[in-house]
Amino acid sequence: MKDYLRNSIRALLLVLAVLLSLPAFSKAVEIEGINYELEATSHKAKVVAKRHGQYAREIAIPETIEHNAVTYRVTAIGNGAFSGCTELVSVVIPNTVTNIEGWAFYYCTSLSSVAIPNSVKCIEEETFRGCSALRTIDIPDSVTTIGRGAFMNCEGLLSVVIPNCVTTISHNAFYGCTALSSVALGCAAKEIGTQAFAHCPRLKDVFCHAASAPKANSQTFDKNASRSTSLHVPGASVENYKATMPWSTFASITSLPAEDSEHQDM
């Protein structure tokens, strides 16, 4: 009985310690048309969804905001913050933002312009899923991981350049990007998940700058698409790709243009 009480007290103390260590966010406040959660101790702010209605047209997120005579630094865009905002056209994100949480721009079907700052390290799960008006996306060099379904069903996306620091492209990352014709993978690419580029029927060229063929599987690309898609890799790595599935199934495997290889090695 004593052991039971002792263990129960320890468990309660542990829970209390965890709760006390969590950021103390206040209720959402609205400042100049944008809703935020404010963290009292660190003076950080997170953009969150509107309580009523949707964000529309152009949104410019500031680096800092003022509330009750206190300055807060905007460091995050919260889970689902702009989800389903079908009239949102463009978003400017400041360099103070280090975290864009999952589903942040989920099915923002009119979103055609968004600049991801160099402070962001990961594009989270389904962040831009269903943003069908996006034609291009500039992924900054700071990003190392592209999460599951991050750009899934971005049906207007024409091309994508994955920067050199990205090591992992997760499952379904670009699934259903039906207009996608060109993909450039950086030299740090290590692993590409299942169906990452599936249902991309217009994919014609894949430029992969990794010296060794990244880990992938038979479902990473469409089987039919790979038969009509050209793969371009470093000259010294052509045989490595030809001997590695699923890369060996591509219609042709050729050396990257010299100037393209030099650019990626910089």
Label every model-predicted segment.
Residues 1-13:
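Bacterial N-terminal signal peptides that target proteins for export
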Residues 11-21:
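Bacterial N-terminal signal peptides
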Residues 24-30:
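Boundary at the C-terminal end of the N-terminal hydrophobic targeting segment
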Residues 33-35, 40, 54-76, 86-99, ...:
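Structural signature of tandem-repeat unit edges
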Residues 194-195, 216-223, 242:
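Short, T/G/N/S-enriched strand-turn elements that build extracellular solenoid repeat scaffolds
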Residues 220-224, 237, 244-251:
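Acidic, glycine/polar-enriched metal-coordinating patches/loops
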Residues 260-266:
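C-terminal cell-surface addressing/anchoring modules of secreted/extracellular proteins
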